[in-house]
Protein backbone atom coordinates (compact mmCIF):
# COMPACT_ATOMS: atom_id res chain seq x y z
CA UNK A 1 0.00 0.00 0.00
CA UNK A 2 1.36 3.41 -0.89
CA UNK A 3 2.41 5.71 1.94
CA UNK A 4 -0.33 8.16 0.96
CA UNK A 5 -3.09 5.52 1.05
CA UNK A 6 -1.81 4.14 4.35
CA UNK A 7 -1.78 7.64 5.86
CA UNK A 8 -5.30 8.25 4.58
CA UNK A 9 -6.51 5.05 6.29
CA UNK A 10 -4.95 6.14 9.59
CA UNK A 11 -6.42 9.64 9.40
CA UNK A 12 -9.89 8.37 8.48
CA UNK A 13 -10.01 5.91 11.37
CA UNK A 14 -8.73 8.56 13.80
CA UNK A 15 -11.27 11.09 12.51
CA UNK A 16 -14.14 8.68 13.08
CA UNK A 17 -12.84 7.79 16.53
CA UNK A 18 -12.51 11.45 17.54
CA UNK A 19 -16.02 12.24 16.30
CA UNK A 20 -17.53 9.34 18.25
CA UNK A 21 -15.52 10.17 21.37
CA UNK A 22 -16.66 13.81 21.29
CA UNK A 23 -20.28 12.71 20.85
CA UNK A 24 -19.86 10.47 23.88
CA UNK A 25 -18.39 13.35 25.87
CA UNK A 26 -21.37 15.57 25.03
CA UNK A 27 -23.75 12.79 25.98
CA UNK A 28 -21.97 12.33 29.29
CA UNK A 29 -22.03 16.07 30.02
CA UNK A 30 -25.78 16.11 29.30
CA UNK A 31 -26.26 13.35 31.85
CA UNK A 32 -27.62 10.94 29.21
CA UNK A 33 -25.44 7.99 30.18
CA UNK A 34 -28.00 5.60 31.63
CA UNK A 35 -28.32 1.84 31.17
CA UNK A 36 -31.39 0.59 29.31
CA UNK A 37 -34.23 -0.73 31.42
CA UNK A 38 -35.06 -4.19 30.11
CA UNK A 39 -37.46 -6.95 31.19
CA UNK A 40 -36.24 -10.18 32.79
CA UNK A 41 -35.19 -12.92 30.37
CA UNK A 42 -35.62 -16.19 32.30
CA UNK A 43 -35.23 -19.36 30.28
CA UNK A 44 -33.27 -17.69 27.49
CA UNK A 45 -29.83 -19.01 26.52
CA UNK A 46 -27.11 -16.77 25.08
CA UNK A 47 -23.67 -17.30 23.58
CA UNK A 48 -21.27 -14.34 23.79
CA UNK A 49 -18.00 -14.57 21.89
CA UNK A 50 -14.98 -12.81 23.33
CA UNK A 51 -16.68 -12.86 26.73
CA UNK A 52 -13.47 -13.37 28.69
CA UNK A 53 -12.66 -9.64 28.80
CA UNK A 54 -13.84 -6.14 27.96
CA UNK A 55 -17.22 -5.53 26.36
CA UNK A 56 -17.89 -9.24 25.98
CA UNK A 57 -17.41 -9.94 29.67
CA UNK A 58 -19.65 -7.02 30.64
CA UNK A 59 -22.28 -8.17 28.13
CA UNK A 60 -22.26 -11.70 29.53
CA UNK A 61 -22.68 -10.42 33.08
CA UNK A 62 -25.51 -8.04 32.16
CA UNK A 63 -27.36 -10.78 30.27
CA UNK A 64 -26.97 -13.09 33.25
CA UNK A 65 -28.45 -10.40 35.50
CA UNK A 66 -31.51 -10.43 33.25
CA UNK A 67 -31.88 -14.14 33.96
CA UNK A 68 -30.28 -15.62 30.86
CA UNK A 69 -28.10 -18.71 30.88
CA UNK A 70 -24.83 -17.50 29.35
CA UNK A 71 -22.22 -19.48 27.46
CA UNK A 72 -18.89 -17.66 27.69
CA UNK A 73 -16.95 -18.30 24.47
CA UNK A 74 -13.27 -17.43 24.26
CA UNK A 75 -9.72 -18.64 23.72
CA UNK A 76 -8.47 -18.09 27.29
CA UNK A 77 -9.89 -20.83 29.50
CA UNK A 78 -8.53 -19.40 32.75
CA UNK A 79 -10.16 -16.01 32.21
CA UNK A 80 -13.29 -17.67 30.87
CA UNK A 81 -13.71 -19.80 33.97
CA UNK A 82 -13.18 -16.69 36.12
CA UNK A 83 -16.08 -14.98 34.31
CA UNK A 84 -18.26 -18.06 34.78
CA UNK A 85 -17.39 -18.24 38.48
CA UNK A 86 -18.17 -14.55 38.99
CA UNK A 87 -21.55 -14.92 37.26
CA UNK A 88 -22.43 -18.00 39.30
CA UNK A 89 -21.40 -16.27 42.52
CA UNK A 90 -23.41 -13.13 41.76
CA UNK A 91 -26.50 -14.92 40.46
CA UNK A 92 -26.44 -17.79 42.95
CA UNK A 93 -26.96 -20.10 40.00
CA UNK A 94 -24.95 -22.47 37.84
CA UNK A 95 -26.48 -21.15 34.62
CA UNK A 96 -23.17 -20.07 33.12
CA UNK A 97 -20.74 -22.17 31.11
CA UNK A 98 -17.39 -21.74 29.40
CA UNK A 99 -16.60 -23.29 26.02
CA UNK A 100 -13.30 -22.75 24.18
CA UNK A 101 -13.48 -20.85 20.90
CA UNK A 102 -10.63 -19.57 18.75
CA UNK A 103 -12.09 -17.60 15.85
CA UNK A 104 -8.71 -17.69 14.11
CA UNK A 105 -9.28 -21.41 13.52
CA UNK A 106 -12.20 -22.78 11.51
CA UNK A 107 -11.59 -26.16 13.15
CA UNK A 108 -12.06 -24.53 16.56
CA UNK A 109 -15.27 -22.85 15.37
CA UNK A 110 -16.64 -26.21 14.26
CA UNK A 111 -15.52 -27.79 17.51
CA UNK A 112 -17.30 -25.09 19.50
CA UNK A 113 -20.54 -25.73 17.61
CA UNK A 114 -20.27 -29.45 18.43
CA UNK A 115 -19.47 -28.72 22.08
CA UNK A 116 -22.47 -26.43 22.39
CA UNK A 117 -24.75 -29.02 20.82
CA UNK A 118 -23.48 -31.54 23.39
CA UNK A 119 -24.73 -29.29 26.21
CA UNK A 120 -28.28 -30.01 25.08
CA UNK A 121 -29.36 -26.40 25.50
CA UNK A 122 -31.62 -24.28 23.28
CA UNK A 123 -30.14 -21.10 21.81
CA UNK A 124 -32.03 -17.82 21.75
CA UNK A 125 -29.20 -15.32 21.36
CA UNK A 126 -25.82 -15.20 19.65
CA UNK A 127 -23.64 -12.15 20.31
CA UNK A 128 -20.79 -11.95 17.78
CA UNK A 129 -18.52 -9.75 19.86
CA UNK A 130 -14.93 -11.05 19.73
CA UNK A 131 -12.43 -9.26 17.56
CA UNK A 132 -8.93 -7.98 16.90
CA UNK A 133 -7.97 -4.41 16.04
CA UNK A 134 -5.08 -2.65 14.31
CA UNK A 135 -2.75 -5.66 14.42
CA UNK A 136 0.36 -5.95 12.25
CA UNK A 137 -0.28 -8.19 9.27
CA UNK A 138 -0.57 -11.84 10.23
CA UNK A 139 -2.61 -14.79 9.05
CA UNK A 140 -4.95 -17.17 10.82
CA UNK A 141 -4.49 -20.92 10.96
CA UNK A 142 -6.44 -21.16 7.71
CA UNK A 143 -4.40 -18.51 5.86
CA UNK A 144 -6.80 -15.57 6.24
CA UNK A 145 -5.67 -12.04 7.12
CA UNK A 146 -6.36 -11.88 10.86
CA UNK A 147 -8.83 -8.98 10.95
CA UNK A 148 -10.88 -10.59 8.20
CA UNK A 149 -10.49 -14.09 9.60
CA UNK A 150 -11.28 -13.40 13.25
CA UNK A 151 -13.73 -10.52 13.01
CA UNK A 152 -15.68 -11.65 9.94
CA UNK A 153 -15.04 -15.19 8.67
CA UNK A 154 -14.92 -16.86 12.08
CA UNK A 155 -18.23 -15.29 13.07
CA UNK A 156 -19.67 -15.98 9.61
CA UNK A 157 -19.10 -19.73 10.00
CA UNK A 158 -20.10 -19.75 13.67
CA UNK A 159 -23.42 -18.08 12.88
CA UNK A 160 -24.20 -20.53 10.08
CA UNK A 161 -23.39 -23.50 12.30
CA UNK A 162 -25.61 -22.21 15.10
CA UNK A 163 -28.54 -21.10 12.94
CA UNK A 164 -30.33 -24.47 13.19
CA UNK A 165 -30.36 -24.11 16.99
CA UNK A 166 -31.46 -20.48 16.77
CA UNK A 167 -34.29 -21.40 14.39
CA UNK A 168 -35.43 -24.31 16.56
CA UNK A 169 -35.48 -22.11 19.69
CA UNK A 170 -37.30 -19.14 18.16
CA UNK A 171 -41.05 -18.80 18.09
CA UNK A 172 -43.62 -16.35 16.78
CA UNK A 173 -43.60 -13.35 19.10
CA UNK A 174 -40.49 -14.61 20.88
CA UNK A 175 -37.82 -14.99 18.24
CA UNK A 176 -34.13 -15.71 18.50
CA UNK A 177 -31.59 -12.96 17.85
CA UNK A 178 -28.16 -12.58 16.30
CA UNK A 179 -26.35 -9.45 17.48
CA UNK A 180 -23.15 -8.60 15.61
CA UNK A 181 -20.87 -5.99 17.12
CA UNK A 182 -20.13 -3.15 14.73
CA UNK A 183 -17.92 -0.09 14.74
CA UNK A 184 -18.15 3.42 13.36
CA UNK A 185 -14.94 2.65 11.49
CA UNK A 186 -17.10 0.80 8.95
CA UNK A 187 -18.04 4.28 7.66
CA UNK A 188 -14.51 4.68 6.29
CA UNK A 189 -14.07 1.06 5.24
CA UNK A 190 -13.99 -0.50 1.80
CA UNK A 191 -14.24 -4.18 0.91
CA UNK A 192 -11.56 -5.04 -1.64
CA UNK A 193 -12.91 -8.23 -3.21
CA UNK A 194 -9.73 -8.50 -5.32
CA UNK A 195 -7.43 -8.44 -2.27
CA UNK A 196 -9.50 -9.25 0.81
CA UNK A 197 -6.47 -10.53 2.70
CA UNK A 198 -4.22 -7.54 2.07
CA UNK A 199 -1.53 -9.61 0.39
CA UNK A 200 -0.68 -6.91 -2.15
CA UNK A 201 -1.29 -3.84 0.01
CA UNK A 202 -1.75 -3.77 3.79
CA UNK A 203 -2.65 -1.22 6.44
CA UNK A 204 -3.90 -2.37 9.85
CA UNK A 205 -6.30 0.58 9.89
CA UNK A 206 -7.75 -0.26 6.48
CA UNK A 207 -7.90 -3.97 7.39
CA UNK A 208 -9.84 -3.28 10.58
CA UNK A 209 -12.27 -0.92 8.83
CA UNK A 210 -12.76 -3.48 6.04
CA UNK A 211 -13.56 -6.22 8.56
CA UNK A 212 -16.19 -4.05 10.23
CA UNK A 213 -17.81 -3.13 6.92
CA UNK A 214 -17.79 -6.84 6.04
CA UNK A 215 -19.65 -7.56 9.28
CA UNK A 216 -22.25 -4.90 8.44
CA UNK A 217 -22.76 -6.40 4.99
CA UNK A 218 -23.03 -9.86 6.55
CA UNK A 219 -25.53 -8.86 9.23
CA UNK A 220 -27.83 -7.16 6.72
CA UNK A 221 -27.59 -9.97 4.17
CA UNK A 222 -28.33 -12.48 6.93
CA UNK A 223 -31.54 -10.62 7.74
CA UNK A 224 -32.58 -10.70 4.08
CA UNK A 225 -32.06 -14.48 4.03
CA UNK A 226 -33.93 -14.97 7.31
CA UNK A 227 -36.83 -12.90 5.99
CA UNK A 228 -36.96 -14.93 2.78
CA UNK A 229 -37.09 -18.17 4.76
CA UNK A 230 -39.59 -16.88 7.30
CA UNK A 231 -37.30 -17.88 10.16
CA UNK A 232 -38.09 -16.68 13.72
CA UNK A 233 -34.62 -15.12 13.97
CA UNK A 234 -33.45 -11.53 13.59
CA UNK A 235 -30.03 -10.09 12.78
CA UNK A 236 -28.92 -6.64 13.95
CA UNK A 237 -25.70 -4.68 14.35
CA UNK A 238 -24.78 -3.08 17.68
CA UNK A 239 -22.07 -0.40 17.82
CA UNK A 240 -20.71 0.00 21.38
CA UNK A 241 -18.86 3.23 20.60
CA UNK A 242 -15.32 4.08 21.70
CA UNK A 243 -14.68 1.86 24.71
CA UNK A 244 -11.72 1.52 27.07
CA UNK A 245 -10.60 -2.07 26.35
CA UNK A 246 -7.44 -4.05 25.65
CA UNK A 247 -7.98 -3.78 21.89
CA UNK A 248 -6.03 -0.52 21.78
CA UNK A 249 -2.72 -2.21 22.60
CA UNK A 250 -1.81 -2.22 18.89
CA UNK A 251 -2.88 1.38 18.26
CA UNK A 252 -0.36 4.12 17.50
CA UNK A 253 1.24 6.15 20.26
CA UNK A 254 -1.06 9.12 19.65
CA UNK A 255 -4.19 7.08 20.33
CA UNK A 256 -2.63 5.21 23.25
CA UNK A 257 -1.53 8.49 24.84
CA UNK A 258 -4.97 10.04 24.36
CA UNK A 259 -6.58 6.96 25.89
CA UNK A 260 -4.24 7.07 28.87
CA UNK A 261 -4.92 10.70 29.76
CA UNK A 262 -8.44 11.32 28.40
CA UNK A 263 -9.98 7.87 28.39
CA UNK A 264 -11.77 8.40 31.70
CA UNK A 265 -13.59 11.36 30.17
CA UNK A 266 -14.34 10.49 26.54
CA UNK A 267 -14.18 6.69 26.41
CA UNK A 268 -17.01 4.47 27.58
CA UNK A 269 -16.28 1.86 30.21
CA UNK A 270 -16.79 -1.78 29.13
CA UNK A 271 -19.98 -1.79 31.21
CA UNK A 272 -21.29 1.25 29.32
CA UNK A 273 -20.15 -0.13 25.98
CA UNK A 274 -22.16 -3.30 26.61
CA UNK A 275 -25.44 -1.38 26.96
CA UNK A 276 -26.18 -1.25 23.23
CA UNK A 277 -25.39 -4.96 22.83
CA UNK A 278 -27.71 -5.89 25.68
CA UNK A 279 -30.37 -3.54 24.34
CA UNK A 280 -30.17 -5.29 20.96
CA UNK A 281 -30.38 -8.63 22.74
CA UNK A 282 -33.38 -8.00 24.96
CA UNK A 283 -35.34 -4.83 24.09
CA UNK A 284 -39.05 -5.69 23.62
CA UNK A 285 -39.39 -3.06 20.89
CA UNK A 286 -36.89 -5.02 18.78
CA UNK A 287 -38.96 -8.21 18.84
CA UNK A 288 -39.16 -9.38 15.24
CA UNK A 289 -37.16 -6.35 14.05
CA UNK A 290 -33.98 -7.02 12.10
CA UNK A 291 -31.62 -5.39 9.65
CA UNK A 292 -30.93 -2.47 11.99
CA UNK A 293 -27.74 -0.65 12.92
CA UNK A 294 -27.92 0.34 16.60
CA UNK A 295 -25.80 2.87 18.46
CA UNK A 296 -26.35 4.40 21.92
CA UNK A 297 -29.41 2.16 22.39
CA UNK A 298 -31.14 3.65 19.34
CA UNK A 299 -31.28 3.08 15.60
CA UNK A 300 -28.66 4.77 13.42
CA UNK A 301 -27.96 4.69 9.69
CA UNK A 302 -25.05 2.55 8.46
CA UNK A 303 -22.82 3.42 5.54
CA UNK A 304 -24.79 3.22 2.31
CA UNK A 305 -22.36 0.60 1.00
CA UNK A 306 -23.51 -1.74 3.77
CA UNK A 307 -26.91 -1.88 2.03
CA UNK A 308 -25.41 -2.72 -1.38
CA UNK A 309 -27.22 -6.00 -2.05
CA UNK A 310 -24.90 -7.05 -4.86
CA UNK A 311 -21.85 -6.60 -2.62
CA UNK A 312 -23.68 -8.42 0.18
CA UNK A 313 -24.27 -11.40 -2.11
CA UNK A 314 -20.69 -11.42 -3.42
CA UNK A 315 -19.20 -11.28 0.06
CA UNK A 316 -21.61 -13.96 1.31
CA UNK A 317 -20.62 -16.27 -1.55
CA UNK A 318 -16.94 -15.65 -0.80
CA UNK A 319 -17.55 -16.36 2.88
CA UNK A 320 -19.17 -19.68 1.99
CA UNK A 321 -16.23 -20.56 -0.26
CA UNK A 322 -13.50 -19.60 2.20
CA UNK A 323 -15.09 -21.29 5.22
CA UNK A 324 -16.18 -24.40 3.32
CA UNK A 325 -19.79 -23.92 4.41
CA UNK A 326 -21.13 -23.73 0.86
CA UNK A 327 -22.41 -27.29 0.61
CA UNK A 328 -23.31 -27.45 4.24
CA UNK A 329 -23.91 -31.19 4.55
CA UNK A 330 -20.95 -31.92 6.83
CA UNK A 331 -21.74 -28.99 9.10
CA UNK A 332 -25.52 -29.18 8.97
CA UNK A 333 -25.79 -25.87 7.13
CA UNK A 334 -28.03 -25.68 4.08
CA UNK A 335 -28.82 -22.59 2.00
From Swiss-Prot:
**S-S bridge residues:** none
First-listed, main subcellular location of the protein, grouped into a coarse class: other
Binding residues for NAD(+): 55, 208, 212, 245
Q: Does the keyword NAD apply?
A: yes
Might you report a single GO cellular component term? Answer: lipid droplet
Name the top EC class: oxidoreductase
What compartments host this protein?
A: Lipid droplet; Secreted
Keywords, alphabetical: Lipid droplet, NAD, NADP, Oxidoreductase, Secreted
Provide the catalytic activity annotation. a di-trans,poly-cis-polyprenol + NAD(+) = a di-trans,poly-cis-polyprenal + NADH + H(+); a di-trans,poly-cis-polyprenol + NADP(+) = a di-trans,poly-cis-polyprenal + NADPH + H(+); a di-trans,poly-cis-dolichol + NADP(+) = a di-trans,poly-cis-dolichal + NADPH + H(+); a di-trans,poly-cis-dolichol + NAD(+) = a di-trans,poly-cis-dolichal + NADH + H(+)
Q: Which GO terms describe its molecular function?
A: dolichal reductase [NAD(P)+] activity; polyprenol dehydrogenase activity
Q: One Pfam family, short name please?
A: adh_short
The annotated active site, in chain numbering, is: 208
| Free-text function comment from the UniProt entry | Oxidoreductase that plays a key role in early steps of protein N-linked glycosylation by mediating two non-consecutive steps in dolichol biosynthesis. Acts both as a NAD(+)-dependent dehydrogenase and as a NADPH-dependent reductase during the conversion of polyprenol into dolichol. First catalyzes the NAD(+)-dependent dehydrogenation of polyprenol into polyprenal; polyprenal is then reduced into dolichal by SRD5A3. It then catalyzes the NADPH-dependent reduction of dolichal into dolichol. May also acts as a positive regulator of starvation-induced autophagy.
Query: What's this protein's name?
Result: Polyprenol dehydrogenase
